[in-house]
Amino acid sequence: ARTVSYSQLYGGKIAAALSRQHPRDLFDCKYMDTTLFCDVKDGFILCLLGSDKPIIESLHPNAIDQTEALENQFEGMSDIPFHYSDYEETRKNLIEQVNANMTNTDKEFLISFENGEPDWSKCCAGDLSNYPSVKWKLQNIDKLVKSNPKKHQEGVQKLQNFLKIQD
């Protein structure tokens, strides 16, 4: 049977939680041992690269108020209590844990990817260029570079500033 790897399964869950900030995803992450992030970082990077959002929006997301989603779409799904304060604490801890585990090499790779010229030798997960979601993201970056280079460069600069990496 073909199954998804542990790294992709849990790395994907973390990527989804940071991108969507939905209570279901963060509930799952609350009970994951995120101190072992290094065990799932490869899968996280793959899902981060294939996301439909800029990398910065996952590494440094604007907090979304999910009170209504918690009440209407999650409440009653678990016997384990999960209040909005748990949700906010989990989101904060997850963001901190992910960013604390990004090495300088990881950061340099993410900048090169967001520039549209990934240095795969710096990618902890190796060359992911053949994955359809990664190809799609790189095509979109290329389109942005051609159609609105200023917006593209501003996005790269924002990521560089957050990661504290200079040209």
Can you describe what each PLM-predicted range is?
Residues 1-167:
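Structured mid-to-C-terminal alpha-helical surface segments
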